[in-house]
């Protein structure tokens, strides 16, 4: 399977540079089961498009100010992006991406406005293992002072005060992500209330978003691509809610590709298993979906693992045709853009 089969032309002007207000004022393309044409709705219409007894599954990770600009002991400039908490949450040990004018060596001490990071290991391809000099609330305060919101590079502006709130879901709880689970950015408290009033339930899993989600695929052969690992957790309460929904005949509606990957990664012996894990699952056409019946997702980059996942879920030809229609109709793309609801049943 070739990466070039997952390409499409996207005018630069359709890349959303800022969010809409309110969050649920974005547009929503709907791909229903079968081969019918896409429907075009507003995101606020979501309660009408789901059924009582369906279960929305959110990713409750919280984006941290993970981009750090500082210097080495020599005075040279250095940049780190904290990518993966190796101890869970805001611990001391992290996997990070780094760059500097000269190689970053094992044992180097990097300083970021008072926050220090010791380089414990060099993994190659710009990845490092680092130990920070604080954890928990002290680390959170230090990141608030020294770090920046890690907006994606296709948002061609510096992050501002609005991004601190808007590049975060309203239910974000567990700190640890270097990017937002963007399908969740469309939800508002009034929309959640309307969903609940219709009998649509919700639960949450946690996947800390890192390079496995946002790094590009190198090379054209998808079979050679290896995902970077990302840590996830499914609580016992979430696992019970998922099983109960299936038993009642309700649909599991994953909000975002990270929720899809969490649920599919945690599938064991006919059910989603509770507990922590680390996933390197690369979902591509041919994947046998077990845990997910529908998904809410944004419009993704050409030639990305995220687009490949959506094509696996909704059908490659149908999804790519829908993307071409989205371009023709002026949908907004990527993190701050519009959304798609893909239903398998």
From Swiss-Prot:
Enzyme Commission code: 2.4.99.17
Cell compartments where the protein resides: Cytoplasm
GO MF term set: S-adenosylmethionine:tRNA ribosyltransferase-isomerase activity
Keywords, ordered alphabetically: Cytoplasm, Queuosine biosynthesis, S-adenosyl-L-methionine, Transferase
Leading EC class: transferase
GO term, biological process aspect, one: tRNA wobble guanine modification
Pathway: tRNA modification; tRNA-queuosine biosynthesis
Cellular component, GO annotation: cytoplasm
Catalyses which reaction(s): 7-aminomethyl-7-carbaguanosine(34) in tRNA + S-adenosyl-L-methionine = epoxyqueuosine(34) in tRNA + adenine + L-methionine + 2 H(+)
Assembly information from the UniProt record: Monomer.
Function: Transfers and isomerizes the ribose moiety from AdoMet to the 7-aminomethyl group of 7-deazaguanine (preQ1-tRNA) to give epoxyqueuosine (oQ-tRNA).
Family statement: Belongs to the QueA family.
PANTHER family: S-ADENOSYLMETHIONINE:TRNA RIBOSYLTRANSFERASE-ISOMERASE
NCBIfam families in the record: PRK00147.1 (NF001140), queA (TIGR00113)
Name used for this protein in its record: S-adenosylmethionine:tRNA ribosyltransferase-isomerase
Lineage, uppermost ranks: Bacteria, Pseudomonadati, Myxococcota, Myxococcia, Myxococcales
Gene that produces this protein: queA
